[in-house]
A protein has these predicted regions:
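Short aromatic-enriched loop/helix-cap "lid" or pocket-rim segments at secondary-structure transitions
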Residues: 99, 149-150, 201-203
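Non-catalytic protein-protein interaction segments used by genome-maintenance enzymes to assemble
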Residues: 113-176
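A structural signal for short, well-ordered beta-strand segments and their strand-loop junctions
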Residues: 108, 131, 135-139, 188-192
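Short, surface-exposed beta-strand-loop junctions and turns on beta-sheet-rich folds
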Residues: 31, 143-145, 196-197
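Metal-dependent nuclease catalytic cores that hydrolyze phosphodiester bonds in DNA/RNA
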Residues: 1-127, 265
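Active-site-proximal flexible loops/turns
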Residues: 26, 53, 145-148, 183
Length: 265
């Protein structure tokens, strides 16, 4: 097998499923996507929520201050207080704290797994978000929680519209959490939060998501098994830029063009 990766992960498997070309430049050629405002928002809100839970902080103003500070720390010279995400981060962190408290005492944060998985040659690595006695909760900061417009009856009762399940839970999130349920032997939940709304999804009766992810891992191993060079892998896929991942990865398109040009010279 071509020795270019050491393990599988849900994030890498999802990238391969969505956009194998992006997987190639990231995992085989080492391209790293710069953290954008949405990514900073998610990381900062999660970190602030963890700090609040561990230290039993419930004062919303303190959580807001901490979340904004963590967002700025991640900005460096790029963006900052002018970003919409700067304000959103603070509200999302508060929502995370309020929702996560209902699950009881936090027993693990970012617990890791690194080990074998049935029928795979390479090990699988995983890292949880918030783990409680009964659940693992993966937090997802988002600009919008997607709902249908409320019906007249819902408006009359002061209720929001129903969740649009085309967006929540997302297939890649389900694939990850089904894998985590298998690895950590515990039920998993997805907590989506925007600055104005939130929604918690369980894995429900969705089927096939774990199998799809494992098949992606097997496909990766098959490709690396028949390829003799990195360029062989590149030549297996045409270079296209129609996947959404390219829009959020500055520099990735130019990097990929050079890789494909070199492989086909």
């Amino acid at each position: 097998m071509l020795k270019v990766i050491e393990h599988h992960s849900a994030s890498a498997g999802n990238t391969f499923i969505d956009c194998p070309q992006m997987w190639i430049i990231e995992k085989i050629y080492g391209f790293e996507t710069e953290e954008n405002a949405r990514m900073r928002m998610g990381h900062a809100a999660e970190e602030a929520a963890h700090h609040a839970l561990v230290n039993q902080i419930t004062d919303e103003k303190l959580i807001i201050s901490d979340a904004k500070g963590k967002y700025i720390e991640r900005c460096g010279k790029n963006g900052g207080t002018i970003d919409d995400e700067y304000e959103w981060t603070a509200q999302i962190a508060n929502t995370f704290v309020k929702e996560l408290k209902q699950y009881g005492k936090l027993i693990h944060y970012q617990r890791e797994y690194n080990g074998p998985f049935k029928d795979l040659c390479l090990p699988v690595v995983a890292k949880t978000d918030f783990e409680f006695n009964d659940y693992i909760v993966d937090t997802k900061a988002t600009a919008k929680v997607w709902r249908y417009a409320p019906t007249a009856a819902e408006r009359h009762k002061g209720r929001k519209g129903r969740i649009n399940h085309n967006y929540h839970p997302k297939p890649d999130h389900l694939r990850q959490q089904f894998l985590y349920r298998e690895l950590f032997n515990k039920e998993c939940l997805l907590l989506y939060a925007s600055a104005w709304d939130h929604h918690t999804s369980d894995l429900g009766d969705h089927v096939g998501h774990l199998e799809t992810l494992i098949q992606a891992f097997k496909s990766i191993e098959h490709i690396l098994g028949i390829a003799k060079t990195k360029e062989d892998v590149v030549r297996m896929f045409p270079l296209t830029f129609d996947n959404w991942r390219w829009r959020y990865s500055p520099g990735a398109e130019a990097f990929a063009r050079k890789i494909w040009h070199t492989a086909w010279k």
